From Swiss-Prot:
HAMAP family: NDP_kinase (MF_00451). This is Nucleoside diphosphate kinase. Its EC number is 2.7.4.6. Belongs to the NDK family. One of its GO terms (molecular function) is ATP binding. The keyword NAD does not apply. Homotetramer. ATP binds at K11, F59, R87, T93, R104, N114. The gene is ndk. CDD domains: NDPk_I (cd04413). It catalyses: a 2'-deoxyribonucleoside 5'-diphosphate + ATP = a 2'-deoxyribonucleoside 5'-triphosphate + ADP; a ribonucleoside 5'-diphosphate + ATP = a ribonucleoside 5'-triphosphate + ADP. Pfam families: NDK. The active site is at H117. GO terms for cellular component: cytoplasm.
Amino acid sequence: MSVERTLMLVKPDAVRRNLEGKIIAHVQEKGFKLVALKKLKLTKEQAQQFYIVHKDRPFYDELCEFMSSGPIVAMVWEGENAISRIREIMGATNPEEAEEGTLRKLYGTNVGENAVHGSDSPESAKVEIPFFFSRLEIVE
């Protein structure tokens, strides 16, 4: 096992419903350490840049509109195998297919408004974390 850092975003649908605290508590209860946190609103251009890997996918424009529709909460979590374990905590992309007790099952509305985003690989985390946080903003 190795200690990793991963990015998690609380998406606009969950922020609108004031679920940030519940989501943070849920992840902390699983033993992860919160090392960075900020609330912000992405512009459409920033959302397009962040999700550039999905540029050719049919849902790209709708995703970017949604992610820039309201405030989000960006977080960096640290822990043993954080990337894969936090993806398990988040659950399947589609809340209807997510396991009971996962964040998306608990708080997601549909496949688009599924409450949270998380880095899907070490390579993604290395790109996604610095998109939102400088080294000075990450507390050991």
